[in-house]
Amino acid sequence: STRKESSAASDVYKRQVFNIEQYISREFGRRIGTKEEEAFFIGDGKGKPTGIFNATGGAETGVTSTGTSITFDDVMDLYYSLRAPYRNKAVWLLNDSTVKAIRKLKDGNGNYIWQPSVREGEPDKILNRPYRTSIYVPELAAGNRVMAFGDYSYYWIADRQGRSFKRLNELYATTGQVGFLASERVDGKLILSEAVKTLDIKAAGK
């Protein structure tokens, strides 16, 4: 569950020249969405969703690198570690640090495996499949699960309680403020672990 609380001076609230309640509601929504993104990727399942990259209950390991960096073979092996039926809708998930490394990789013919979009509105691709980035995907470093490839329709999200936004008039009355409380209860878990595979970087010293 996610819970956020804030307050504003009551005189500012009364003399507002713009809709401060609407602004706070949007800001709460943005922050709650950010926390949900984090949990859906790396949550440990203890009072929060089980993230795709969590070692327990998350995606299956498709490939473990032979070194502490990423290679063309690692990316190709990850692609084919995912069964063909799931590859039809598969998307890559990675951090910007991994994107940077992959953009430098070439195949055996010296061609970059990164495929820049040639049409407006279409994403760049890796091995002909689109990718998405998030700051919550683990960075490219030894011992991390740094990249996922799969069909994320098998990651189920349950809204246990719809998002609520309340104005608390009494709670901060003695301080001349107006309070706001936003909350939402959600859960998430990959129900079919074989639908998403990860690339794990070899731990240092192993």
Predicted regions and their residues:
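Structured, hydrophobic secondary-structure cores that serve as assembly/anchoring elements
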Residues: 10-206
